[in-house]
Amino acid sequence: MAEEISTQAPRILAIRGGAIGDFVLTLPALAALHRAFPGCHMEILGYKHIAELGLHGGPVAGSTYARAVRCIEYGALAAFFARAFDLDAELCRYFSSFDRVVSWLFDPDKVFETNLGRAGVKNFTPAYTPIDNGSHASLQLAAELAKISVPLDDPVAHLVLAESALESARAWLAERDGDVGTRPLIAIHPGSGSSRKNWPVGNWRSLGDRAAAAGARLLIIGGEADTASLDYLEKKLEPHTPLLARNLPLHLVAALLTRCVAYFGNDTGISHIAAAVGAKCTLLFGPSGPSVWAP
């Protein structure tokens, strides 16, 4: 029988590790919690540079997924993953301040769950599930919420950005692009978390050449793992004066993608962000299965 909880606006803590794509694929589950508990105070414990996306947008206009974000990479938190250790008093107060904790962390022996109980957490929902090749990942990531009577009405990830994030993109473009708005902006993200999933960088160069020849302005996006590809494309596409978005905060990347008429990328977290903000995407899937992992 599904567990029943109060429909009053509670304090909810969502705990989500994983990479960028994993986080975005969990947004439908977070949106379902917001729909089930309108006005709830949600916070996210996760990798801060990723989870902060939830501070800058939400499932609908004027909303955010999170009111606050806390970094999961915190030394005192390690005791919560071990047996019979003293627990940090401040973290105990933090966890026990929530009416419900929902965790997507792998916890096969329930050590973390047990320690949250020791910390004073009364309502805990273990939402982790290993993703198989059955249904779409967003459906699998939300499946455990049915046990607390939270249905997944919409499996699509939506990230409607706050005006402050959109303004940051306008300012970034204005500083770098004298003809901003006069040419269509096309985004290219040549990397991913695995070289096996990457389209050859020479093909990205050819795509950039063709897009520029058709009158588009190029926006090339990447992080530290994409340095070699970005350096190559910056050099080879230099005649087209591409805009380079290197190592930018994710909310700024998301906002820049809302300004693009098209986005091209591999199976990667940035591609999930592009789809979530409503960009028109062409995504290349190699060894991974799009029926499970595509936006």
Where are these regions (language model features)?
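Catalytic machinery of carbohydrate-active enzymes
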Residues: M1-P295
